[in-house]
Swiss-Prot record:
PROSITE patterns: CHORD (PS51401), CS (PS51203)
Region annotation (Disordered) ranges: 61-82
Gene Ontology molecular functions: zinc ion binding
Protein's recorded name: Cysteine and histidine-rich domain-containing protein 1
Name of the gene this protein is made from: CHORDC1
Length: 332
């Protein structure tokens, strides 16, 4: 009568009369499962497939074994009728402490709230720079030069995206390749509104060739103030969000930063003739009264106090999320 061999990795039937010392090929070790790898403790082969694991040939020769291994012994739980049901409950339940209720998030205010001018703090370095350049005193002599029709050699073209300079009368006949739109910075991408070639790299953005042709604009009288992009970034702490705009020699009397709880509008005039504009729909809610602007000779820092101490996922509210908020406001 053929008997079943219970050696690990064998599982064959054998005749007890012909059983010999090398009749069985099996694994004397135990199964090992670690980090998705499967194998036997007695040999080095490992596999991630369970079917391959079952087909791993034994590593040891011996006699077939017909004795069924004993089943694992289950721990015996002794109870008595005298003990109450409460005494049989796990002890750890006695030490459970109810977690505090989560703090409810502040409801997002309406974007139509009145805008408020943030306090401007002017550093000593900016005051010294403006005094030196005589930009804050409204010098009449400079104004006359600005109003003059004379174009100096080396004057830069005022059209956006054009880097040409005036070299003489021949420059008046040159074709200007420029951007007719305005620079847009949104969710890490930079592009011009007129051609929308988006990039995340600031230097690549500055090097983008214009999409419109026309005549150079050499004087401010014709061009007005020149809207230009500025490198800017942001960081946050537990209670504040800070935006840094890298614009040199900004003019406090011509610049303003206005905000409400969820919107920020930045208008900065710097280096006499340049302007920077940025409108931001903030990801979180700010405390306008405790927010302020610090103007230095090299940059402007906008420090916004968070209405609640939480981590912002980004500076700007994503467009999709903003549309959902508008739908909710309309429904209400």
């Amino acid at each position: 009568m053929a008997l079943l061999c219970y050696n690990r990795g064998c599982g064959q039937r054998f005749d007890p009369e012909t059983n010999s010392d090398d009749a069985c090929t099996y694994h004397p070790g135990v199964p090992v499962f670690h980090d998705a790898l499967k194998g036997w403790s007695c040999c080095k082969r490992r596999t991630t497939d369970f079917s391959d694991f079952l087909s791993i040939a034994g590593c040891t020769k011996g006699r077939h074994n017909s004795e069924k291994p004993p089943e694992p012994v289950k721990p015996e739980v002794k109870t008595t009728e005298k003990k109450e049901l409460s005494e049989l409950k796990p002890r750890f339940q006695e030490h459970i402490i109810q977690a505090p209720k989560p703090v409810e998030a502040i409801k997002r205010p309406s974007p139509d709230e009145p805008m408020t001018n943030l306090e401007l703090k002017i550093s000593a370095s900016l005051k010294q720079a403006l005094d030196k350049l005589k930009l804050s005193s409204g010098n009449e002599e400079n104004k006359k030069e600005e109003d003059s029709d004379e174009i100096k050699v080396g004057t830069s073209c005022k059209n956006g995206g054009c880097s040409k300079t005036y070299q003489g009368p021949q420059s008046l006949e040159e074709v200007c390749v420029y951007h007719s739109g305005v620079p847009i910075f949104h969710e890490g991408m930079k592009y011009w509104s007129c051609c929308r070639r988006k990039t995340s790299d600031f230097n690549t953005f500055l090097a983008q060739e214009g999409c419109t042709t026309g005549k150079h604009t050499w004087t401010k009288k014709d061009a007005g103030k020149k809207v230009v992009p500025c490198r800017h970034d942001w960081h946050q702490t537990g209670g504040e969000v800070t935006i840094s705009v890298y614009a040199k020699n900004s003019l406090p009397e011509l610049s303003q930063v206005v905000a409400n709880s969820t919107l920020l509008n930045v208008h900065i005039v710097f280096e006499g003739e340049k302007e920077f504009h940025q409108n931001v729909k903030l990801w979180g809610v700010i405390d306008v009264k405790r927010s302020y602007v610090t103007m230095t000779a090299t940059k402007i820092e906008i420090t916004m106090r968070k209405a609640e101490p939480m981590q912002w996922a980004s500076l700007e509210l994503p467009a999709a999320k903003n549309q959902e908020k508008q739908k909710e406001d309309t429904a209400e």
